Amino acid sequence: AERNLGQILRDDFSAYRDELLISTKAGYDMWPGPYGNWGSRKYLIASLDASLKRLGLDYVDIFYHHRMDPETPLEETMGALDSIVKSGKALYVGLSNYDGPTLERACAILNDLKCPFIINQNRYSIFDRTIEKNGLKDTARRLQRGIIAFSPLAQGMLTDRYLNGIPADSRIATDGRFLKETALTPER
């Protein structure tokens, strides 16, 4: 996807880079080995470098850390994000899939570093309103950080994609890690 977007940016939008907001994120498998996943400094910086190369860009506007890392100290992960901003490879940082208490700790670390943390990304749709129930939405408001939804169409369940069964090329049929057949009910 990043290579394709990079080609489109080069071919059609290079004159408009200052008008575009481009983001990317890291936190899941990028390559085999001990540093190909999660939230270590080595992983985050190398992941962003690879993304920038694929995109053909010098920087992104927002770089997200995709998920909390149970093995890497939060200070290391936030320090890596701060280094990325200070190096000019990202203008702002965001977090994704962080719970409320960890979001608060991360925000405090980034504030101390004077790192521009502006947004938190979470699953949010009419079918999944967890962030309203677990206090994360209120935490983000109190911390004065934005929230951006991922999967606002509930992985296609809020479209006509599954009205007539499960298409052979659908996520349920081909992957099933994130959307399972049991999620499709008469109510959904």
PLM ranges: what are they?
Residues R17-M30, Q121-Y124:
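A short, structured active-site edge motif that brings together acidic residues
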Residues T24, I62-H65, L95, N122:
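Conserved beta-strand positions
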Residues P70-R188:
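Beta/alpha (TIM)-barrel catalytic core signal, keyed to glycine-rich beta->alpha loops juxtaposed to Asp/Glu
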